[in-house]
Amino acid sequence: MRHPASILHDKSSRTCYLCVTLHDNWNEHRILDEHHIFGGPNRKNSEEYGLKVYLCHDHHIYGPEAVHNNTRIRHELQRTAQRLFEKQHSHKEFMEIFGRNYLDSVEIGENSEKENEPV
């Protein structure tokens, strides 16, 4: 089975998602790590729905801003992924698939209003 592309980040750009997001640094990297935003039991779901980004080593595992070392950055990435997922799917569907909410109540309300709009 072919895995879908990331809905957050274009791998062919050869940029690190966090270098761009945090520092507006668009330098290309020879080596990038694929990071699944929701790991553990949701790693397969992250892959299936394209919830992954490409990171340099410093932003993946080694530096102080590394997603595996920095809870604040990891949670912001999870919130961003949930918001993008819910642009294509419902909040209810996110909860059924991933089993946890990462957004605050205002953001959830905005997304559920979209679900109730007439087609």
Language model segments and positions:
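Cys/His-coordinated zinc-binding microdomains
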Residues: 20-23, 57-60
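A broad, low-specificity signal marking well-ordered, structured residues that form hydrophobic/aromatic
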Residues: 32, 53-54
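Short recognition patches in nucleic-acid-associated and regulatory proteins
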Residues: 24-43
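Secondary-structure junction/capping motif
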Residues: 16, 33, 89-90
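Short, charged surface segments at domain edges that flank catalytic/cofactor-binding sites
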Residues: 1-21, 44-50
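Polybasic, low-complexity binding patches
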Residues: 43-53, 61-119
